[in-house]
Amino acid sequence: MKTFSAKPHEVKREWFVIDAQDKVLGRVATEVASRLRGKHKPEYTPHVDTGDYIIVINADKLRVTGAKFEDKKYFRHSGFPGGIYERTFREMQDQFPGRALEQAVKGMLPKGPLGYAMIKKLKVYAGAEHAHAAQQPKVLELK
């Protein structure tokens, strides 16, 4: 018996919507990353993008545990000497709601062309409305 390997043109993708209101950042991010990779499917193949499309709504209402709301820091660098910038989780959620979730998921995906293709299937919205009603997404409940 030969080992099954998924072909890119045979992959069936579905659309799911996740309501992130009052959900913990890391728990949402791990479920999203797993579904973007396609690990929940029996035809999962590591070198083929078998994942689904994920829409996350209410990303501005994500929560973190402990004191991370004030203590968790996000860093970026301009490339110039002394050009490091930092933001706390609170500042990140105020200025760019949803970016913390995007960065958390991106860090859980493979680096390289396959990971870049996977992250494009993630759609994050700060409010309860999204622009993908035509795709008829299924509601995905998280524990």
From Swiss-Prot:
Keywords: Ribonucleoprotein, Ribosomal protein. One of its GO terms (molecular function) is mRNA binding. GO terms for cellular component: cytosolic large ribosomal subunit. GO terms for biological process: negative regulation of translation; translation. Gene3D superfamilies: Ribosomal protein L13 (3.90.1180.10). InterPro entries: Ribosomal_uL13 (IPR005822), Ribosomal_uL13_bac-type (IPR005823), Ribosomal_uL13_sf (IPR036899). Part of the 50S ribosomal subunit. Belongs to the universal ribosomal protein uL13 family. HAMAP family: Ribosomal_uL13. This protein is one of the early assembly proteins of the 50S ribosomal subunit, although it is not seen to bind rRNA by itself. It is important during the early stages of 50S assembly. This is Large ribosomal subunit protein uL13. It comes from Neisseria gonorrhoeae (strain ATCC 700825 / FA 1090).
